[in-house]
Amino acid sequence: LPASCTLPVQDGMIVRTESPEVQELRRSVMEMLIAEHPNGCLTCHRIDICGPSDICLRHVSVNDRCVTCPKNERCEFKDTVRYLGMELESPLAYEYKQIPLEIGDPFYDRDYNLCITCGRCVRVCEEVRGDDAIGFTQRSGRALVGTSFGDSLLESGCEFCGACLDVCPVGALVEKENKWEKARKIVSAICPHCPVGCSLNLEVNEKGSLIRVIPELNSSVNRGQACFKGKFGLGFVNSNARVTTPLIRRDNILQESTWDEALDLIASKLTEHKGSRSALIAAPDSTNEELYLAQKFARLAMETNNIDQSTNVIPELTIGLERALGYAAATNPVWDLEKSDCILVFNSNLTEQHNV
């Protein structure tokens, strides 16, 4: 049976992906992968009803049980074993690798005792991100994943984009923050940090707090990728210091008020500043819908056409773009840059503004 990644598509080709022969081949491959990972729970028929405090009839140690793994409810490896129906009577023996946990780097921990050496993290780092921060190494004749000289991720040049976490099918790579939290809802959102506007899926726990960020795989903007700010820099939404009630300054002191009182005060102040001598300036990170409402409010309520947004874009550049392209912004997808022979970057810090 030829592998799909090595056989070119031909006219009239009939592709069967669910035949008994294909499934049996998949099971044989998975048997080898299972031997690289704690498998007492993976091949047990009670896995769906077994709790963390239940007595294991297979005598699986606490550290090797699926219910104590931080990736238990989002483990692609476990889902694949279920899909293939691999309830093995005598799975291949798993030998604990005795690899110390890597917890010294920011943002995420690495437990290579759970690694199945599938190579996904290495490939996404090299082929998609172009970083080469991690690769295959050897230890006592065993192939492992790690940095070139055993250095930390910071020393290896890692960008901490989190792409390796998103493709890891097991619990070898896991976020430090909210490691054990389970998602109860997923909310679609746009990253607010830069003009690229990456599509993100926000995992929310039962208390309504953001616990994890997963880039949207099917987004035409970022294609399942994010930068360190989009992946790990949205925790501010959970801050207890966020202002949740209106504040009105009285005697030079900000005091809490009701929404009705605050809106009435704003309306009374705005009536004093109407017409062409007034202007409305909106935040550049507002959504299209918010900006539309802002301009509508300016024209109808404030009776002015003086509308702008505060931005760090140099006017000379935007004027030139508008004259040349008819639009003061990019008119083509970001991914067209892959086809460019020459890229001119002017007065921009790509790490800050277009890191993805």
What do the predicted segments below correspond to?
Residues L1-C161, L165-V167, G171-V174, P195-A226, ...:
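Ferredoxin-type iron-sulfur electron-transfer modules and their immediate structural context
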